[in-house]
């Protein structure tokens, strides 16, 4: 299985880069992992809805350049479906059994995802009703994908 993370913006903090590198290494025995960072747009303070829509659309165009037609696309959205770790593992496992060979997880920028990206999504996933920094969300997502593969493989993992 190939897992791709498409994210908006670059990681600057060393501690986050280290955590991403650690989970990338751990995941290498379960899947082929690719992380793609697309450039983010600067959002002016007090930006209007129209300006924010334009920013989301620009970032969305950059994201969609990397989305393959045959990939199963999961967008991270505050209004998405909340799953337990076991349910996420089951979803990944079922997709593989059904013949899906490529899952793309998309994490938007600070103001979310554009309409075209949301239209292309096969599944909207939420980790919480709370808002998290998109940089930290990468680490949380990678940890949950790693946990999913441990569950699928019936291997122990901290609960």
Descriptions of predicted regions:
Residues 39-101:
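S-adenosyl-L-methionine/SAH cofactor-binding core of RNA-modifying enzymes
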Residues 115-159:
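Structured adenosyl-cofactor binding patch, chiefly the S-adenosyl-L-methionine
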Residues 15-17, 84-86, 115-117, 136:
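Short glycine-/acidic-enriched loop or helix-start segments at secondary-structure transitions
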Residues 1-27:
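N-terminal beta1-alpha1 ligand-phosphate binding loop
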Residues 31, 70-71, 121:
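Short, well-ordered alpha-helix to beta-strand connector turns
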Residues 11, 78-81, 109-111:
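Short glycine-rich anion-binding loops that position phosphate/pyrophosphate groups of nucleotides
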Residues 6, 34-36:
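General small-molecule cofactor/ligand-binding pocket signal
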Residues 86-128:
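A mid-sequence interfacial segment
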């Amino acid at each position: 299985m190939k897992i791709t993370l498409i994210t908006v913006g670059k990681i600057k903090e060393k501690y986050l880069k280290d955590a991403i590198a650690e989970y990338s290494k751990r995941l290498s025995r379960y899947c082929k992992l690719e992380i793609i960072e697309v450039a983010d747009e600067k959002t002016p303070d007090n930006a209007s809805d129209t300006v924010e829509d334009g920013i989301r659309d620009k970032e969305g165009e950059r994201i969609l350049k990397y989305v393959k037609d045959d990939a199963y696309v999961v967008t991270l959205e505050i209004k998405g479906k909340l799953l337990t770790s076991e349910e996420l593992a089951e979803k990944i496992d079922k997709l593989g059994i059904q013949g899906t060979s490529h899952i793309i997880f998309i994490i938007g920028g600070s103001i979310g995802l554009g309409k075209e990206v949301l239209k292309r999504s096969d599944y909207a996933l939420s980790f919480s009703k709370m808002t998290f920094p998109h940089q930290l969300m990468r680490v949380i997502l990678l940890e949950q994908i790693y946990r999913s593969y441990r569950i699928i493989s019936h291997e122990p993992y901290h609960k």
